[in-house]
Amino acid sequence: MFITEIQLKNYRNYEHLELSFEDKVNVIIGENAQGKTNLMEAIYVLAMAKSHRTSNDRELIRWDEDYGNIKGRLQRRNSSISLELNISKKGKKAKLNQLEQQKLSQYIGEMNVVMFAPEDLNLVKGSPQVRRRFLDMELGQIAPVYLYELSQYQKVLTQRNHLLKKMQGNSKNEETMLDVFTLQLIEHGAKILRKRFEFLHLLQEWAAPIHRGISRGLEELEIVYKPSVDVSESMDLSKIKEVYYESFQSVKQREIFRGTTLLGPHRDDLQFFVNSKNVQVFGSQGQQRTTALSLKLAEIELIYSEVKEYPILLLDDVLSELDDYRQSHLLNTIQGKVQTFVTTTSVEGIEHETLKEAKTIHVTNGTVDCEIDRK
């Protein structure tokens, strides 16, 4: 799949922009704070209906405007699809082929993207929240039902936490309601957990050989899910629910005392091991970066295996963060099969066949100038 064009209106620092793209490589060049990352982000938001940079949608709307709008056209193997996302203070509305979608989960997944930005290098050494977000965003693309369960879980979690804070003063009168929320949380949480186990099993199958290749056969990568309750990948849904119920019963008084939910997918984490050593704790910076690169390349192949088309790859100022060897491995892997967008302040020092035929887009203060063929 590839995106052929995009239109922006009141998006970040773009008042109005219409731009067409090559189906292979597009290089976006500009100094910092000129709008190249905003353009890359707009492609991501068009696909995912949320930003990888902020959770505050208001930041996506141009200063002093009431709304922002992104339109694009996606070419898939057997069809051409128009996508539109309107962002306002009231929320987001999405359209596919001019038809408004009732739920964003019906929209997300039509256009698949893999973003690789400098902050993704923190996937290994960053906070658990970074890794959970990685899971949610990537899994949501290939399993819309996961996004539904996640949104329902978040709603119940918010209600349950509000009730727990209220119960800190007087718990007895609200215990029945707490039990209702607990059962709802278990219902959605168990399904989220089951989907995460399945996804990580597939990701492991792709990431391990990729990591082995990048490390020239010297390193074996293992991805380990660390749930907040004592469950395992081998358990079925009913067993996971049973363990959740018993675990919530055991921490009930502690949750009331602390006024917050202590268990569930929102408390889980991922760990990465290279040659049986925890990369977050014992890995070198090079090993941490190789792990992040392996995961991103594995995402590309996993999405292809699920939807039978390669996703769009967004490389946002990340090539300069990789050494020549990892840079070459990345570009060799995607060459000729993945539509790729690259942002950079300069193409000097990046000598690779993949970039030779690229469309070059120069960005200066929210305006663009294009040229094709850097040769």
UniProtKB/Swiss-Prot annotation:
Task: Give GO BP annotations, semicolon-separated.
Answer: DNA replication; DNA synthesis involved in DNA repair; double-strand break repair; SOS response
Q: Does the keyword ATP-binding apply?
A: yes
Spell out the CDD domains in the cross-references.
ABC_RecF
Care to name a GO molecular-function term for this sequence?
A: ATP binding
Q: Where is the signal peptide?
A: none
Where found? Cytoplasm
Pfam families for this protein: SMC_N
Keywords of the record, alphabetical order, are: ATP-binding, Cytoplasm, DNA damage, DNA repair, DNA replication, DNA-binding, Nucleotide-binding, SOS response
Answer whether the UniProt record assigns the keyword DNA damage to this protein: yes
Q: Which GO terms describe its cellular component?
A: cytoplasm
Q: Which InterPro entries does this one have? A: DNA-binding_RecF (IPR001238), DNA-binding_RecF_CS (IPR018078), P-loop_NTPase (IPR027417), RecF/RecN/SMC_N (IPR003395), RecF_2 (IPR042174)
Q: Where does ATP bind?
A: G30, E31, N32, A33, Q34, G35, K36, T37
Domain of life the protein comes from: Bacteria
- Role summary: The RecF protein is involved in DNA metabolism; it is required for DNA replication and normal SOS inducibility. RecF binds preferentially to single-stranded, linear DNA. It also seems to bind ATP.
What family does the Swiss-Prot or TrEMBL record give for this protein? Answer: Belongs to the RecF family.
User: What name goes with this protein?
Assistant: DNA replication and repair protein RecF
